[in-house]
């Protein structure tokens, strides 16, 4: 059975506009509190205007167009507008500076960029660099633009185009819709090639996983350039005719008030959001929400999980995946049995195994690499852009993907995440998980944030170093820190060194960028 058939993203939006028409599709709140709202038909019209503008400016099927934007409705106009004419969106992390952005532009040979005033200084020099492939800049601005070759005023020019699509490029669900670069926390990012089929199946899969309904209001503050916002929030919500509330920025002080304000029924969070929300003063109405599920990503310590559930009266729904899997293919479902700290079980379309370094399946309870099986270009990514070597290493011909995550499986088929392979420390013959140590250290009442890495050790392969951020106003001596560790973990897991810091470098999804600590 094929639930997608030939329905690419253009057909999806035309159908959504017809079926849901005036129902609210997107509510956007800026960092200043300004709210913009679009019905399904209005959003489709803006998508068509953007598509017409891009086509009029010479963008054709297969062209790579970079988007460097904070969360905003224009991201959605461009994302789906490009898809409607067969062009390929290349979202760029909004935190990236010149060198990081230029590397992606050069690597994928993007001739076009859509950006805002905030980021235009990154791209203006590229327009005049004869070695850069960039030839045209679409600038989202409320300022009057001076006439400059290669710069297009996106808002004013888009408004000149009709709300119906002018050009219907032949499309296939197998066409590339997006190249999404991985975070590159330990190495240069790789371009994950994502098809129309990938994005359509993400909508169906994640809406099934969350049991989404037409009357749901899904609030997200995850970056639109990230796979979570796209494939765990937006597309699932749209696949059932629900409403997306997109916030421009995360604010610990405002986040729970926004959940109450918009009467959100589903939201998603990373541990940093949960921790900072829990640090806010208790509000008498904070339990008067309508949240049915909170999608939870990455690792949350037991004490944090229990405290959040008790205080906020929420239910956490675990979802585990990566950009290459498109969705959180291992996870919990509403109403199903849950077994914390399990990350859940694989859903339909997928299989999962634990394998050793010889690529052989291991018995239940034994830690190894989590490998998952799907179909390339459909339920898994198609390939790494211009990296056949990396594709061959990660993706086997029969559809098994090596995730680089370590974990184990229990007798009932529940999977447990241990750590990323790059976060496993080899110490005196023992494999030590950074996350395990981090969770223990995070349980100290004076510690707000922590990261652990391995550092070279001539005798024991690697030593363990901890980077610790204290709760505001608290103090903790090195002696007290080591005493706590010695009391709460095996001797070989106790860090050899600690460094106290004001903050930790994190990427958009909350992962610590550990290469910046080494």
Swiss-Prot record:
GO terms for molecular function: acid-thiol ligase activity; carnitine-CoA ligase activity; crotonobetaine-CoA ligase activity. It catalyses: 4-(trimethylamino)butanoate + ATP + CoA = 4-(trimethylamino)butanoyl-CoA + AMP + diphosphate; crotonobetaine + ATP + CoA = crotonobetainyl-CoA + AMP + diphosphate; (R)-carnitine + ATP + CoA = (R)-carnitinyl-CoA + AMP + diphosphate. It comes from the Bacteria. The keyword Ligase applies. PROSITE patterns: AMP_BINDING. Keywords: Ligase. Pathway: Amine and polyamine metabolism; carnitine metabolism. The keyword Metal-binding does not apply. One of its GO terms (biological process) is carnitine metabolic process. Gene3D superfamilies: 3.30.300.30, N-terminal domain of ligase-like (3.40.50.12780). Pfam families: AMP-binding, AMP-binding_C. Its EC number is 6.2.1.48. Belongs to the ATP-dependent AMP-binding enzyme family. HAMAP family: CaiC. Catalyzes the transfer of CoA to carnitine, generating the initial carnitinyl-CoA needed for the CaiB reaction cycle. Also has activity toward crotonobetaine and gamma-butyrobetaine. This is Crotonobetaine/carnitine--CoA ligase.
